[in-house]
Amino acid sequence: KLTINAACKMCRLCVKKGPEGAVEYVEDTVRPSVDKEEWKGIAVYVDHVDGKIHPVTLELLGKARELAQVTGHPVYALFMGNDIGEKCHELLHYGADKVFVYDEPELARFKIESYTAVFEDFIQNVKPSSILVGATTVGRQLAPRVAARMKTGLTADCTILEMNEDTDLSQIRPAFGGNIMAHIKTPDHRPQMATVRYKIMNAPERSEEESGEIVNCSIAKERLGSHVDVLDIVLKEKEKFIENADVLVVAGRGVKKQEDLEMLQKLADLLGGQLACTRPMAESGWLPAKCQIGLSGRTVRPKLIITCGVSGAVQFTAGMNHSENIFAINKDEKAPIFKTAHYCLVGDLYEVIPQLIQKIEEKKGA
């Protein structure tokens, strides 16, 4: 008996090893094609809350400007919301050639149906070659739906973006647990879409003068309908996020007991920082998932990060390798983290951390 289900990897082994004629692999004889000349420009989705623009948008505008230099394409920003007429001018200080604004009362709050409809309208009218979306809570919902609507590809959590002269975008991200870097392209479809996490790219400096133009867009009201009604909004108490910390102390597998985290927390408090962790620590429940650094956690870029008993797997270092100063403590002198760190200390964290705490306390008491 031969069974093929959704887990099929298209390896064709069943064709070669199975009974003759039982399984046939049929390939598309006509490869899809796209007229790339019709699609021009690199667009950035403007992620915001009540007009306050998320900094990942500015980072993506800087990257879009860099990519556009290869092809000579313009840089677009897609801004949708309500009462955002004044706020959209800020984007002209960060390299956007055109800001396409959809200012409608129905767009005051994020609703997936209406936001997708606006995104689709923008793509159909402007035809951007590439679209960059921040990997935020909203971006992670919106980008896949738009890609499916346009029948195009989407690469999530890219760490590197490179543009070819033929306007094909190389979307690069770690794969297979960080063991390889996958180079993904969408050569036969447009637009090309990618999401990028906050603090992966560098934000450009704000220019003194505006350069570019605002394009006010309209869309039929019936397209903004939604099956979701926002009845009330309850503001959460403001939290501290490791992405915003200037100093981080990171707990790795070298920490033997959950109680020992108090020692690292004390070090973090003395330095005015926060405690973070690697994936195994979060999965064991020792620290909440919001404290996890890496591809499956948060991306950080603090002024100082101290790793304690962290081996330094690629999936972890991809989330922190842009930190200004990386100080690594590990008793294994061959630990991969030492290839990433700026300062390396081979030693037992249970000996090093107490001494470090003592020195800092003495310095503060002096």
What name fits each language-model region?
Residues K1-A366:
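N-terminal glycine-rich FAD/FM-binding segment characteristic of electron-transfer flavoproteins
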